């Protein structure tokens, strides 16, 4: 897909993707990536949607992508901003910021099925884009690995929530931990499951 656009004079082509949209703790992480036109022999043969890769493979590809990319950027939007502006706004504005942070301006942007109004160049939302375009796959890996590292750091700061395991998603064990210990500054309190679990902790605290 990227080669067709570049052949039409619309390059360089950047892929953009996010990680953590569906989580209820931690940031949403968004990456933009421009890959070289020729990927032969650079070690990205297994590159696809980050969710279909093992953690070990993602970590290896993360380093390769950063080494070979023409340009890439990774940004994190906090839970506080998500609560303030909403996840959709955080996602779309974050994608604009990630593209703007590239040190090579793309001629065209491909996203994983997300419309991004306000970009200064044309863009195309691609259904299952992280499987269809290598630049989106690369952005997917960059976003996922960088966010996972953030959650592992938060797990060290706030042990007892299992953040390194579930990466901030709303598992039963995670919500039970919030109801027992209360939320952290990195939880998304605008999300009903977090608000309910935190309220349960507050009620128990008051009774105690």
Swiss-Prot record:
CDD domains: RNase_HII_bacteria_HII_like
Cofactor(s) needed for function: Mn(2+); Mg(2+)
Keywords in alphabetical order: Cytoplasm, Endonuclease, Hydrolase, Manganese, Metal-binding, Nuclease
UniProt superkingdom: Bacteria
InterPro entries: RNase_HII (IPR022898), RNase_HII/HIII (IPR001352), RNase_HII/HIII_dom (IPR024567), RNaseH-like_sf (IPR012337), RNaseH_sf (IPR036397)
Annotated RNase H type-2 domain residues: 11-203
GO cellular component, one term: ribonuclease H2 complex
Compartments it resides in: Cytoplasm
GO biological process annotation, one example: mismatch repair
Single GO term (MF): RNA-DNA hybrid ribonuclease activity
Cofactor note: Manganese or magnesium. Binds 1 divalent metal ion per monomer in the absence of substrate. May bind a second metal ion after substrate binding.
EC number: 3.1.26.4
SUPFAM superfamilies: Ribonuclease H-like
Catalytic activity: Endonucleolytic cleavage to 5'-phosphomonoester
Positions contributing to a divalent metal cation binding: 17-18, 112
HAMAP family: RNase_HII_B
Function noted in UniProt: Endonuclease that specifically degrades the RNA of RNA-DNA hybrids.
Similarity comment: Belongs to the RNase HII family.
Protein name: Ribonuclease HII
